Amino acid sequence: MYMNNNSKVLALKYRPQTFDDLIGQEVVAETITNSIKADKIPNAYLFTGIRGIGKTTIARIVAKTLNCSNGIENKCKVKCENCDSIASSNHIDVLEMDAASKTGVDDVRDLIEFSRYGPTSAKYKIFIIDEVHMLSKQAFNALLKTLEEPPEYLKFIFATTEIKKIPITVVSRCQRFDLSRIKSSELFEFIKKIKDKENGKITDDALRLIVKILSLIHISEPTRP
């Protein structure tokens, strides 16, 4: 597919930055937004779903929403230093850890040690742990006590494709969201908007074929309840 010359990868350029940007996850977005408005924020969020469904993207949106200096009603749409830093993974109070490469108890203990200090510039210190099911048993045990009784300023956001590999003691202490597969019609409209904005030279029939292939890939991805 030909697009105008652009130094920024389209997947990054059009990555959702707010809850309103998400497609196919309206219930999740509304539930989280309402709970934040009501000041009923869980100690930990747990997002489950197939690869590429948007777990890490939503995790960052949650982190931005919790720490947006313009408030929840703004929905991160007005320029905010906290939101910009979180979006670029540069915020000192929002740490992301890939549990696929950092599985050990020492990695978790480093997080716990860091959690002892309050946030520097944001309202909450937030730890986003991707592929959390990859943590070792010892790492989960080390994490559990902090998860049970975290300081008020600390929030966890977990993402996983393998919910069954996470100890029930951890799952039970999270607010869990199972992300839905995106409908083909919604995906088509999303890609078409990008094509139009980028003046892409591709027909709607070709776009439908791309969506069909993407849907087949997602169907082949097993669902893990």
Predicted regions and their residues:
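Conserved small helical "lid"/interfacial subdomain of P-loop NTPases
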Residues: K183-T203
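P-loop/Walker A NTP-binding region and its immediately flanking N-terminal helices
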Residues: M1-R176, S185-E186, D204-D205
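A short helix-loop-helix "switch/interaction" segment in the helical subdomain of ASCE P-loop NTPases
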Residues: D205-L216
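Residue-level detector of conserved catalytic or cofactor/ligand-binding positions
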Residues: S215-P225
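Aromatic/hydrophobic pocket-lining residues that form π-stacking "cages" and hydrophobic walls in ligand
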Residues: A59, I191, I210, I219
